[in-house]
């Protein structure tokens, strides 16, 4: 009997199973890859793009210029741990090949110029600034492109529409209707003015009949033409310049240069690939028809026709939901630093131009033209 008690049957023991333990269905992704990959893009491609945007920097007469070549980073002075201990920034020197070209004599001088110490990203996706570890947070911003929206006017209870052409870099172009059934344009968030003023200034159409043929004969177009103070291309350019740069003496050449620089200069205006894609899709272009990174005259015409179609209630014209994630994009650390670096470069560009005009051509060297303080200051502002 004792032996029977000791050898209890195995069926009496419970079979325990844990449902808390489940096998991994997928590997955990690298959650900081968006940070490290974006900064690697900036070091390899973003910096080169920023330098290309300002090349070449010419003097007033155009007989001398400065060009930027390859860039490279040196070795950091301290390791990440040493920077934390010494309360210093984890950074490396940036060197750029700069060429000075005298077009009159054909002389070319090339030097590798130190452009300042640049903060580096650690393997953890962070920056060490004065010994403190910091993270740059990505931004959720409006995607470049053209967007149409509507709202109710509080006084008249009319539906008014607006169109915003948002670039990745450059001036905004906005069209809007109002309770008086007028179509206005706002350039770079300045005072609004009749939209037909821009049509004439760009040379898209000049006479009343040409504008009606271009935009249609709706009541809105006719009312806007009646409010337009200009009747020729030259008058429109002067009017635009006076409203955009009040206090400065307007000339036709300066007005034309201003308008071209705002929307048609790749160095100052960039829709980016996503902006061009979204604009083409909204306005009915095919990629073969329009692949420009800047605005085109046809972009402006079709945008105006679209907002007129919305106001008239025509079929097939719909507004956009700007809060929809399809109309948003993530601006990562590499792009944020690139934008700040561009600000420093544009400040330095002015200094280089001034020095080219002041120094004797024989004495000019790339090192003597470049002042790195604006770039260093811009990067410090960011971090």
Q: Which positions does each model-derived feature cover?
A:
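N-terminal non-catalytic structural scaffold regions of very large proteins
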Residues: 1-383
């Amino acid at each position: 009997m004792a032996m029977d008690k000791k050898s209890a049957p195995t069926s009496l023991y419970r079979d325990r199973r844990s449902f808390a333990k489940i096998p991994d269905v997928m590997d955990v992704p690298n959650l900081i890859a968006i940070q490290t990959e974006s900064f690697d893009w900036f070091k390899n491609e973003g910096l080169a793009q920023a330098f290309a945007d300002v090349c070449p920097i010419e003097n007033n007469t155009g007989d001398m210029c400065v060009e930027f070549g390859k860039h490279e980073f040196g070795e950091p002075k301290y390791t990440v741990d040493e920077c934390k201990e010494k309360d210093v920034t984890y950074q490396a020197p940036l060197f750029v090949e700069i060429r000075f070209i005298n077009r009159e004599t054909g002389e070319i001088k090339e030097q590798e110029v130190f452009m300042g110490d640049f903060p580096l990203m650690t393997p953890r996706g962070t920056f060490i600034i004065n010994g403190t570890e910091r993270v740059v947070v990505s931004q959720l911003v409006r995607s470049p492109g053209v967007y149409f929206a509507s709202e109710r006017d509080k006084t008249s209870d009319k539906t008014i529409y607006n169109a915003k052409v948002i670039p990745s870099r450059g001036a905004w172009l906005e069209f809007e209707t109002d309770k008086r059934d007028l179509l206005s344009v706002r350039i770079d968030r300045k005072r609004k003015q009749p939209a037909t003023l821009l049509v004439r200034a760009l040379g898209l159409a000049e006479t009343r009949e040409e504008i009606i043929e271009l935009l249609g004969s709706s009541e809105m177009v006719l009312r806007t033409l009646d409010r337009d103070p200009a009747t020729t291309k030259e008058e429109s350019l002067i009017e635009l310049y006076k409203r955009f740069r009040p206090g400065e003496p307007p000339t036709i050449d300066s007005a034309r240069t201003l308008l071209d620089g705002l929307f048609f200069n790749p160095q100052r205006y960039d829709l980016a690939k996503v902006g061009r894609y979204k604009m083409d899709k909204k306005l009915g272009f095919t990629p073969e028809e329009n692949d420009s990174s800047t605005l085109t005259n046809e972009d402006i015409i079709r945008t105006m026709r679209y907002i007129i179609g919305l106001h008239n209630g025509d079929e097939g014209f719909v507004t956009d939901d700007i809060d929809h994630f399809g109309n948003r994009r993530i601006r990562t650390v590499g792009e944020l630093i690139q934008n700040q670096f561009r600000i420093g470069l544009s400040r330095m560009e002015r200094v280089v131009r001034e020095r080219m005009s002041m120094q004797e051509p024989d004495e000019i060297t790339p090192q003597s033209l470049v002042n790195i303080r604006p770039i260093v200051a811009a990067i410090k502002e960011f971090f």
